[in-house]
Regions:
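Non-catalytic substrate-recognition and accessory regions of acyl/acetyltransferase enzymes
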Residues: 1-54, 129-148
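Acyl-donor binding region in acyl/amide transferases
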Residues: 41-120
Length: 148
């Protein structure tokens, strides 16, 4: 994320209490993440221009959770993903995020489900709440997440 985007992406997440800072048992930072709960219109707008400044309504206006920012510079990506599925979004049928190497491999939406949601319930929700994408984008449902 460019530095000039911090004011529109990171600070509102903190103000809305939609961020997490994961720490190791020794007190070292493992990961930082921020999320929003989009409605379908905000989701479509985000997918059209994911560097846009979100309005206050966009941060918590719907039931489509999106990880907007995730950084694990010291190797805490696995712990962060596990924490997301087991704690933060444990009851969510799906949480979405953009693949971090989209410029190299093409835009992709990755999807995970919370640990308390069955694979069938997640798949049903996914099929009923497909992202409205105008630009070509690949949608990847995490098969491993669905199966276990």
């Amino acid at each position: 994320m460019p530095l000039h985007m911090m004011a529109s992406q990171i600070f509102p997440a903190i103000a809305n209490k939609q961020y997490a800072l994961g720490m190791s048992e020794k007190g070292s930072p493992l990961f930082y993440m921020a999320w929003a709960n989009f409605d379908d219109a905000a989701e479509a707008e985000y997918l059209t221009n994911y560097n846009l400044a979100l309005t206050p309504h966009n941060w918590n206006g719907g039931d489509r959770p999106w990880i907007l920012f995730f950084a694990a510079p010291f190797g805490g990506a696995y712990e962060g993903e596990r924490w997301i599925k087991e704690n933060l979004f444990k009851d969510s049928p799906e949480v979405r995020f953009l693949y971090h190497e989209g410029k190299k491999r093409g835009k992709r939406i990755l999807c995970k489900r919370g640990k308390n949601v069955s694979a069938m319930a997640s798949l049903k929700w996914h099929n009923e709440n497909m992202p409205l994408v105008a630009a070509p984008m690949q949608l990847e449902k995490d098969v491993a997440s669905l199966l276990g």
